[in-house]
């Protein structure tokens, strides 16, 4: 974890601008993810002629690479400093675009082209884990550990914004100039971000002996489990709300997803200081309660308005879960290990979103679509109970956690 430079307290607009000046690098990395997201499956299946399996694999490779490389990103950020990790990650985003470009140029050799696409996706996954983890830690190093929750919140806001912006823009660029034009745009985005990052002042890496990975995992896994359980609610809404509306014979599934996103972002903007004021665990328990009510409303909905209110509440409830628990998780380890702690904590969400779809699909095929929302509410209730137990633990078992309140 970087050591923040002592300076007068930041607040309000100046604080947010300072954070945004760093998390914009994560925005750039996620823009390189969003731009090809709606293009590559159709390109692999319809243009290159490969099966739907390969189309799905090309997309999934990035997520697997992110999952496997994220703990290394946190550890190297602790050892080398977050700026170097961010630049390294952005270089990976640039190389992914180069992979797409060469894949487009070798379209007459489908197997070679597919391998180059896969290589680009793997490099992108590694780049994103380094750029995302590094930008969070860089932001904390710039504004101080008191504002960890706000840095995490802004990082997630720019993530969703980049993905929402990137997908439609990617389709436009692809129709305009094909895969090669899209690849050049991706390379340009990454290159501009690299050139903006290099001149920025370096935040020093923390001094001290790092804890072994097993020790870091032992400090944060309970917070990660609570996050993973709560993420199931997000997973079933993002993956199956369209199918839920189809089964019910309703229109407006896309609007429901928009409501979820607006509630998610709006809650973070409305309550930027909530974690500092009442503590991460308290905020998490409030969020779990709201998310449970929302998921239950969706599960028992007999009218479209009930489902929409439920989705809105679920989005608002899930919004602050990641930063609220993350603040406590990273403060459960010494400062020189907080990068590894944040990365390890984030892996639990990655895993949860990876397994929620298949498991919910099995439950849905057995008991129907609405049941998955009731089951997700039950998982969030377990997260609420787990967080309540964590709050009741003696303070010495979660060092520095109280400082977030």
Curated annotation (Swiss-Prot):
Example of a GO cellular component annotation carried by this entry: plasma membrane
UniProt-listed Pfam families: MFS_1
Keywords for this protein: Cell inner membrane, Cell membrane, Membrane, Transmembrane, Transmembrane helix, Transport
Residue spans crossing the bilayer: 19-39, 47-67, 85-105, 129-149, 157-177, 178-198, 224-244, 252-272, 283-303, 309-329, 344-364, 366-386
Locations listed in the record: Cell inner membrane
Keyword Transmembrane helix assigned: yes
Membrane topology value: Multi-pass membrane protein
Molecular function GO terms recorded: transmembrane transporter activity
Disulfide partners: none
Entry similarity comment: Belongs to the major facilitator superfamily. YhhS family.
Protein name stated in the entry: Uncharacterized MFS-type transporter YhhS
């Amino acid at each position: 974890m970087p050591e923040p430079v002592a300076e007068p307290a930041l607040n309000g607009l100046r604080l947010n601008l300072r954070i945004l000046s760093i998390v914009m690098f994560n925005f750039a990395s996620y823009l390189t993810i969003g731009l090809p997201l709606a293009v590559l499956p159709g390109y692999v299946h319809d243009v290159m002629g490969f099966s739907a399996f390969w189309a799905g694999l090309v997309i999934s490779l990035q997520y697997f690479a992110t999952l496997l490389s994220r703990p290394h990103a946190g550890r190297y950020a602790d050892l080398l400093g977050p700026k170097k990790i961010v630049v390294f990650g952005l270089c990976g985003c640039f190389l992914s675009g180069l992979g797409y470009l060469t894949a487009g140029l070798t379209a007459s050799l489908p197997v070679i082209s597919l391998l180059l696409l896969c290589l680009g996706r793997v490099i992108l996954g590694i780049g994103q884990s380094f750029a995302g983890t590094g930008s969070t830690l860089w932001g904390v190093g710039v504004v101080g550990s008191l504002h960890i929750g706000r840095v995490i919140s802004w990082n997630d806001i720019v993530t969703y914004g980049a993905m929402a912006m990137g997908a439609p823009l990617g389709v436009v660029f692809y129709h305009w100039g094909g895969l090669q034009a899209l690849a050049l745009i991706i390379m340009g985005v990454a290159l501009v971000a690299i050139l903006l990052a290099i001149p920025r002042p370096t935040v020093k890496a923390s001094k001290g002996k790092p804890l072994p990975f097993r020790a870091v995992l032992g400090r944060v896994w309970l917070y990660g489990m609570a996050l993973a359980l709560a993420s199931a609610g997000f997973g079933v809404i993002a993956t199956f709300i369209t199918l839920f509306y189809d089964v019910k014979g309703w229109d407006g599934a896309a609007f429901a997803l928009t409501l979820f996103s607006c509630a998610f972002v709006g809650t973070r903007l409305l309550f930027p200081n909530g974690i500092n004021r009442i503590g991460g665990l308290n905020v998490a328990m409030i969020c779990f309660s709201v998310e449970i009510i929302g998921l239950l409303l969706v599960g028992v909905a007999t009218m479209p308005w009930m489902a929409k209110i439920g989705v809105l509440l679920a989005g608002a409830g899930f919004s602050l879960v990641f930063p609220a628990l993350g603040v406590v998780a990273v403060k459960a380890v010494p400062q020189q290990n907080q990068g590894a702690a944040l990365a390890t904590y984030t892996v639990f969400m990655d895993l949860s979103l990876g397994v929620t779809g298949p498991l919910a699909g099995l439950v849905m095929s057995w008991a129907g679509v609405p049941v998955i929302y009731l089951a997700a509410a039950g998982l969030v209730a377990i997260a609420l109970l787990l967080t309540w137990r964590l709050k009741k633990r003696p303070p010495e078992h979660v060092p520095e956690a109280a400082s977030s309140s």
